A protein has these predicted regions:
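Structured loop/turn residues at beta-strand edges in well-structured enzyme cores
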Residues: 37, 79, 118
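Short, conserved beta-strand edge motifs with alternating hydrophobic and charged residues
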Residues: 42, 83-85, 124-126
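Short, electropositive, low-hydrophobicity segments enriched in small/polar residues
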Residues: 47, 51, 66, 131
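Short, surface-exposed acidic-centric catalytic microdomains
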Residues: 55-101
Length: 196
């Protein structure tokens, strides 16, 4: 990776006045990037537990995601996998869960970071925020229909529901996801990681 370019991005993030409250508390932007990454995961934003550990998806959601991808934890945190949330910081608690990711992070920082990872073969879009941003008008009327239509976005994007335990009702109401979609995700991830 071009370390100078990457260091400049980190410096910009830390000096951005909108991230001041995090920088002052010693909290760095939380993501995982590598020039050798072949699979990119774009999720929502770090949760409270992730903010405390500073490790992306270091929670129950991450355990489920690793399972859905058909890999182990070591592979998930290897240089083959990049994790770039829609917000690099925990946005705080809302009335019904975490607050949404702040929109400026993806708009102002994603492209510069993505330019440093030229070998991405598959981008897994997790949840509605990443789908709305990256699929734009290509997104269906809701998350469920977008995930159901995942084949339309391949081979570049693979939209999936958030693996949060809070989504257990959705998963129960939509058994086709784990029955039909997850096996395809596992197969694609396996093929990409095996192709060196």
């Amino acid at each position: 990776m071009n370390d100078k370019k990457f260091d400049k991005i980190i410096k910009r993030l830390k000096e951005d006045s909108r991230n001041k409250s995090y920088t002052e508390r010693g909290i760095p932007p939380i993501f995982q990037v590598s020039p050798k990454a072949q699979i990119l995961i774009i999720g929502q934003a770090p949760g409270k537990k992730v903010e405390e550990s500073l490790i992306p998806f270091n929670d129950k959601s991450g355990e489920k995601l690793v399972q859905w991808m058909g890999i182990d934890r070591d592979t998930f945190y290897s240089e083959k996998i990049a994790i770039l949330p829609m917000d690099f910081y925990y946005p705080g608690k809302g009335k019904t869960g975490d607050l949404p990711p702040r929109s400026f992070i993806a708009k102002e920082y994603h492209k510069d970071i993505l330019d440093l990872m030229p070998d991405i073969k598959l981008t897994i879009l997790i949840g509605s925020y990443s789908m709305k941003y990256y699929l734009g008008k290509g997104m269906k009327e809701n998350l469920t229909e977008t995930v159901r239509s995942y084949r339309e976005y391949l081979p570049k994007y693979f939209p999936i529901v958030h693996p949060s335990p809070l989504n257990f009702r959705w998963q129960k109401a939509n058994p086709w996801f784990e029955g039909e979609v997850v096996p395809v995700l596992k197969e694609m991830v396996g093929k990409i990681l095996a192709d060196r």
